[in-house]
């Protein structure tokens, strides 16, 4: 998932450099959403790992 966030970020940077503002904004938004989902899943995974060790 982090890979796809980076892909959309690169697409946004390239589109922004070429003057495609709408595509750049959409790609940056998708990258941001995927990154936040990745962070949430990371935190949930860490919490589950800590709870399993506590038992």
UniProtKB/Swiss-Prot annotation:
Pfam families: DUF1328 (PF07043). Keywords: Cell membrane, Membrane, Transmembrane, Transmembrane helix. GO terms for cellular component: plasma membrane. The keyword Transferase does not apply. It comes from the Bacteria. The keyword Ubl conjugation does not apply. InterPro entries: DUF1328 (IPR009760). It is a multi-pass membrane protein. It is found in: Cell membrane. The chain crosses the membrane at residues 4-24, 30-50. Belongs to the UPF0391 family. This is UPF0391 membrane protein Meso_3110. It comes from Chelativorans sp. (strain BNC1). The lineage of its organism: Bacteria, Pseudomonadati, Pseudomonadota, Alphaproteobacteria, Hyphomicrobiales.
């Amino acid at each position: 998932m982090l890979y796809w966030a980076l892909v959309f970020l690169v697409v946004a940077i390239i589109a922004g450099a070429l003057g495609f503002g709408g595509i750049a904004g959409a790609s940056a938004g998708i990258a941001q959403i995927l990154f936040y989902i990745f962070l949430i899943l990371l935190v949930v995974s860490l919490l589950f790992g800590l709870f399993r060790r506590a038992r």
